[in-house]
Amino acid sequence: MMEVEGSMNRAPDQSSFLRSRRSKALYQFKQQKLPACKPVLTPISVITVFMLMGFVFIPIGLITLRASRDAIEIIDRYDVECIPEEYRTNKLLYITDSSIPKNCTRYLKVQKYMKAPIFIYYQLDNYYQNHRRYVKSRSDQQLLHGLEYSHTSSCEPEESSNGLPIVPCGLIAWSMFNDTFTFSRERTKLNVSRNNIAWKSDREHKFGKNVYPINFQNGTLIGGAKLDPKIPLSDQEDFIVWMRAAALLSFRKLYGRIEEDLEPGKVVEVNLMNNYNTYSFSGQKKLILSTSNWLGGRNDFLGITYLVVGSSSIVISIIFMLLHLKNPRPYGDNSWNKKSLSS
C-alpha cells in the first residue's frame, strides 16, 4: 500500500518537472537564448570556403556548357530576306497590303547530324510582351469559362466588336503570331507534329474545354492569327503557347516538332507565309530548328554563370590569401563564444 502511495506521490513531481522543462524551453525560445552555432570567420576559413566554391562551380559550369553546346541549332532570320526587293524601302506597305503575296522559300543546310525530335521555334526580337498594358489585356476567367464570365473590362481595347463580346478577348490573343511553315527534304514533305507543344497544366486548368472562339478577329483592324470557331481553346495549342507571355524583349515559342532525323549535308526547304507584322516596331523574326539534351535546349547562360561565379570565387580567395600573408592580424579573444555555448 505504501508502494502505491509512493508512486502516486512521484507522478505530480514528474508532471511538474515536465512543465518546468517546457516553460524553460519556451522562455529560451522567446528570449532567443537557444543553443546555436556561432562560427568565427577566420581568414583561413573564408579563403577555404571561396576556394571550395571555385573548385565546385567551375567543373559544373564546364559540364553544363558542354551539354548546352551539344544541342544543335539552325537559326534563320527571314523577316528581311522574305521581302521583295522593290518593297525593301517600304516594309509597312508590303506587310499591310493584302494583295502582295507573302509566300517565301528558305533553304536551311544541316551542318551536323540532328537526332529526332527536332524542335521548331519562332523567335521574335524587340517585342515587349512584358509591357504592363499588354500583359493585363486578357481575361483568364473568360479563357476558362467563356461567356459565363462577363467582367472583361481588363481586355480593353479588344473587349468587344460590333457590339458583341470577343472570345478570347484582349491584346495578347488579338496579336497572335500567324506566320506558317511547311518543311520538305529532297522534295519529300517532313511531317510536323503540333500536338503536346503547350504545357499540360495550361491545357487542363487554364483553357476551358467548352470555350470556343466567338467574334474573334472580326473587327476593322486584324491583329494576327485567326482561331477555328469549331475547336475549343483547350485544343488549340498554338494559341495556348502564345498566351504565355514572355518576360524579355527577345523570346522563342514552340511551333512544332519534326519526328525524323536530319543528316549532315542535307538541305531543308522551308515554305513560309510572312504574315506577321514586326516591321512597324523594328522587330525581327527568326526560325529555329533545334535538338535537345539532358538540360533542355541550347542555352549557354547557366554554364557561363557557373564559370563566372567559380572564377570569381577563386580570384577572391587568392586576393584574401595575399592580403592575409602581407598583413596578418592576431586573432581576437573568442572566449565569450565558448562561454555562451557552455551556458
From Swiss-Prot:
<feature type="glycosylation site" description="N-linked (GlcNAc...) asparagine">
    <location>
        <position position="218"/>
    </location>
</feature>
<feature type="transmembrane region" description="Helical">
    <location>
        <begin position="43"/>
        <end position="63"/>
    </location>
</feature>
<feature type="transmembrane region" description="Helical">
    <location>
        <begin position="301"/>
        <end position="321"/>
    </location>
</feature>
<keyword id="KW-0325">Glycoprotein</keyword>
<protein>
    <recommendedName>
        <fullName>Putative ALA-interacting subunit 2</fullName>
    </recommendedName>
</protein>
<comment type="similarity">
    <text>Belongs to the CDC50/LEM3 family.</text>
</comment>
<keyword id="KW-0472">Membrane</keyword>
<feature type="glycosylation site" description="N-linked (GlcNAc...) asparagine">
    <location>
        <position position="178"/>
    </location>
</feature>
<feature type="glycosylation site" description="N-linked (GlcNAc...) asparagine">
    <location>
        <position position="103"/>
    </location>
</feature>
<feature type="glycosylation site" description="N-linked (GlcNAc...) asparagine">
    <location>
        <position position="191"/>
    </location>
</feature>
<dbReference type="Pfam" id="PF03381">
    <property type="entry name" value="CDC50"/>
</dbReference>
<keyword id="KW-1133">Transmembrane helix</keyword>
<keyword id="KW-0812">Transmembrane</keyword>
<dbReference type="InterPro" id="IPR005045">
    <property type="entry name" value="CDC50/LEM3_fam"/>
</dbReference>
<dbReference type="GO" id="GO:0016020">
    <property type="term" value="C:membrane"/>
</dbReference>
